[in-house]
Amino acid sequence: MVSIIIATYNSEKTLKRALDSVLNQSFQDWECIVVDGASKDNTIEIVKEYVKKDSRFRYISEPDHGIYDAFNKGWKMAKGEWVMYLGSDDEYTKEGIKALMDNSDGADVVYGDTYFREFNNDKIRFQQSSPVKMGGFCCHQSLAMKREIIRKNGGFDEKYKILADKDLICKTIKMGANIKQIHLAISIFSLDGISSTNFQRYIESFKINRKHLPFMTCVFDFVCITGKYLIKRVLKK
């Protein structure tokens, strides 16, 4: 079984799209756990509608310390062998989870490609995932990881507010996990939200690389990435 964890907070505008994408999967051996951070809008009312429709949906609602706190709560509640994570403004492609599970034999982690939804509209562009390596990154929305691997790594390190998923992947590589890649779009990722905070993202990425990679490699990567960021800022002016 695949346990799908969705973190929410005041997500009434986008949540139905995410939940419908789970409900409409061709792969049906799943449970979906919504971990809500005590929303003040109609998020929980929407979740309750889906719980009534299908007993595979579950939820909790209580204050949390951000998305990775919610994700940690979720995997600890999970019953499935595999765990996946979805943002409340993201969605799965219809065949996405099936494609991962069809290629999961012998794997500890399996991941695929991603569509990106542009800011403030529904324009979508395709992004092929690069092979995961130490210091690299792939969208957690398009990745399935065995729950036991998450447990052995202690889950997400919540001191990283943006890229704790990258840190978890690095820890998973270090432990020698078997990671498989497939070339099929698994999810549609919305570029709105915390993950679009570019400079903070670069700083956090450097800290994670410093934890897992040789120092000079980290410095070189940081200079290159920061240089690209500054050039983009200048060109926009």
Predicted feature residues:
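Acidic helix N-cap motif at the loop->helix transition within catalytic regions
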Residues: K13-K16, D41-E49, E95
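Short aromatic/hydrophobic "clamp" motif used to bind/position activated sugar donors
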Residues: V83
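Cell-envelope/extracellular polymer assembly enzymes that use nucleotide-activated donors
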Residues: M1-S3, E31, D167
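Short, acidic, metal-binding catalytic loop of nucleotide-sugar glycosyltransferases
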Residues: D20-D29
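Glycine-rich, basic loop-to-helix element that forms the pyrophosphate-binding segment
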Residues: S61-A78
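Conserved nucleotide-sugar donor-binding catalytic segment
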Residues: F126-E204, I208
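Conserved donor NDP-sugar-binding/catalytic core segment of glycosyltransferases
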Residues: E91, E95-K123
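A conserved acidic beta->alpha catalytic loop
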Residues: Q28, D36-E45, G87-D90
